[in-house]
């Protein structure tokens, strides 16, 4: 997985904060 996120991806993650934290844990 590419750790770098596009602007659109960042916006989507900011909307679903709980999901974003889970995704970031998976990326680590």
UniProtKB/Swiss-Prot annotation:
The lineage of its organism: Eukaryota, Viridiplantae, Streptophyta, Embryophyta, Tracheophyta. This is 14-3-3-like protein 4. Belongs to the 14-3-3 family. It comes from Pseudotsuga menziesii. It comes from the Eukaryota. SUPFAM superfamilies: 14-3-3 protein. Disulfide bonds: none annotated.
